[in-house]
Amino acid sequence: MVIKLFHRHSVFSCVCILALAVSITMAVNFGSARMNAKASTEKPKSTVSESSQAVIAPVKASSPNEMRAVWVPFMSIDMSREEDKSEKAFKKKFDNIVSGAKKCGMNTLIVHVRPYGDALYKSSYFPWSHIVGGTQGVNPGYDPLAYMVEAAHKQGMQFHAWINPLRIQLSGTPSIIAQDNPLTKWKNDVSKKDWIATNGDGKYYNPAYSQVRKLIADGAQEIAKNYDVDGIQFDDYFYPTQNPEFDKTAYDNYSKSASKNGKPLSLMEWRRGNINALVSLVYSEIKAVNPNISFGIAPQGNVQNDLNMGADVSTWCSVKGYVDYICPQLYVNFDNPVLPFDSAAQNWHKLVKNTNVKLYLGLAVYKSGSDADNGTWKKSNNILAQQVNVGRKTNCDGFMFYSWDYLNKDQTKEEVQNVMKVLNS
């Protein structure tokens, strides 16, 4: 997940989401790694004070199996800039992550295995990632994913494979696109060139086409079939823009066809339908090979932003056949003037109507002790600990922390120590 704020059966279910979201948009800057969101005038008040530096009384976890995960983005395992790109060097880097995360009380790693339409494993669908080989398409001579799963399990930790489903290239990364990349194969094929969509300097798979959705789903199934992962997770990157030019040809063709039998869906309704079709297909393909693997999504915490990106989170949380868990990225604190953390947690709890869908809360370790959000993250050193308490009171099923690197920085040291006390109480 580069850092972002929040980065069906009928598409009309978006009406339910809008009602619950109360048109709230978080007015918070989340840095260069996750997307920013627009603010709304709705200003619910927090019921939690975070002004005190005192250690707070922990709320007990409702289950001994509470999720305590940390995201490991591709930057944390990037070997492309390392002088030593060997298998031994990679394993040493990842072993340090496993031992460090376990020491911090984590029980699950969410690791980037397909950041740019590529693979940190041997794939029949996607080229080798430049993250491990230095250049996309170059075989590193070993299987990073196989080792990471084995290393995590040896330490008693679960491993979830993290996928960016649509992103292929952004801001010149990766700098070289492999010859066996679907982008290379499709861009010069008149019948397939629209399967790739462009937004600014980014290139993306276009989920309007069933063939593209099948490719993404087959890629997820490949992981489920070939590796002993405990889960597979999509990030929040779906449609990167609301600009109708992004998929104009596909939508125009749909509209012409749909007009013959009635009124076409709006662009946003249609896009949400495309993403729902993708999510449902991925879910079914994973379950077809291993029903025990969890499939989850980590959408932005702002529901309106999710809708704008084509993410019909209300349907995913209420209808069978989409996800096993949802983990909104609630990267706000209790002082947020638009959406305090506790209000956001309660809103998401209300969205989860399918009792088989687990609710995890994504927490912003990276903001702890920083100047983010007008310095409000410096007002207390127990914000994360209080957020865990709120999550437990809200009956959520666990937490995911962004990100691994920030569990070990001086900036976040006191916050991490305090939240560990609550997690391990």
Label every model-predicted segment:
Residues 25-45:
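Sec-dependent signal peptide cleavage junction
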Residues 322-340, 348, 355-425:
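Substrate-binding cleft of secreted/luminal carbohydrate-active enzymes
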Residues 92-118, 227-229, 322-323, 394-398:
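Catalytic domains of carbohydrate-active enzymes, especially glycoside hydrolases
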Residues 64-91, 161, 166-222, 226:
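Active-site-adjacent "subsite" loops/lids of carbohydrate-active enzymes
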Residues 183, 187-319, 331-332:
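Polysaccharide-binding and catalytic clefts of secreted carbohydrate-active enzymes
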Residues 105-140:
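Aromatic-lined carbohydrate-binding/catalytic grooves of carbohydrate-active enzymes
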Residues 77-88, 127-141, 199-214, 264-274, ...:
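The substrate-binding groove and active-site-proximal loops of carbohydrate-active enzymes
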Residues 85-104, 131-155, 273-278:
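Aromatic- and glycine-enriched glycan-recognition loops and surfaces
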